[in-house]
Amino acid sequence: MLAGCQPGYMSTASTNEQASAAGPPPAADRASYRDVLGVGEFRVIFTADIVSMLGNIVAEVALTVLVYEQTRSPALAALVLGLSFMPYLIGGALLGATADRLPARRVLVGCDLASAVLVGSMVIPGIPVPGLLALLFANGLIAPVYQGVRSALLPQVLPPGPRYVLGRSLMRMVAQSAQIVGFGAGGLLLAILSPRGALTADALSFVASALVLRFGTALRPVRAARSGSMARDSLAGLRGALAHRPTRRILLFSWLVPACAVAPEALAAPYATHIGLPARAAGFLLMGIPAGTIAADVIAARFLSSRRQRRIIVAAGLLTFAPLTAFAASPGLGLAVVLLVISGLGSAWAAGMDGLLIDTAPSGLRNRTLALAGAGLMFTQGAGFALWGIAGQYASLTVVIPVAAIAGALAVVTLRPHPRP
């Protein structure tokens, strides 16, 4: 499960604001997905990202089945998914300086090859379950490095502005779609191959991604040589980003809002049984938010100017949570899916936050701030899954989901970005 945000600055000239409100955004503030995909290097990164993302998801599915077949333990099988989130905290904190210390292409290719070796090692016959989990955890440490370096590379391939926002939009849409396609592909592979066969195919996919990146991206030198250890440099960058108040607010908004928004997904299976349906009906619920999110990204990134993207951040954030309060009334499956799609539409706030983070990050720390944003998002989403899942065991789902919605709305209002004068 892999799985991104920021605000913009409004002009104080009222005449400019009126002109913007009255007519379409100027050409300089518009771009299309065709423009973005017309950049060859972005296409390469985009393709490799799809392959790596699907590979990680398929690995989780196959390894979950493999662990369960060996142990018949639901707890250990569930631990596989938990371990996919935990390394983000460690990797993001201790390896966040990678983007500033090593050439991006070298890191991305190295990450894919390391993942190929680790996933390939999982197919060794007779390897004990603790060994499988250790390999999964090690592979999980690579993911935040890969995503952080890729995030830092993107503004160099797509300069900050409309194209960058659209590029980030495409990445988010792929992340949402990969959740659905990846689990389906994993199930299909397991229907054709054994779990070890699926893992072998996954290892080969990482090799393919490495080759695409090696021959499709430019070798960019690092901006400046740095001394000291990687961990110390990473922690210094972490402190620097969080010490900058505007950046800290953006990061906290981008982490806490999604952490609350995942509550209905974390409780999808229990909610399905709560309304009298089999647990497998959770699949319909799980499609709701990703569907809304994809639509929101297309609308916000493609059809709204940068200024309007940033103006709707708070309203869109509140839209994320308003529909979730209706779960207090135990809506049926059809209405619940509609509510979740509307909640997903609220994720339009992310388009505005993308540009804002780029504009706000402290000088010299942009790469590490972008890496931190991605790692923190994945970790807090995982923590949100765990928190709301545990809460659902001890309290009614008709209470837990609305409480998560209220907490999320409070985060939106409390951490709302302040535009520059």
State what each model feature region is.
Residues L2-P421:
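Alpha-helical transmembrane-bundle signature of multi-pass membrane transport and export proteins
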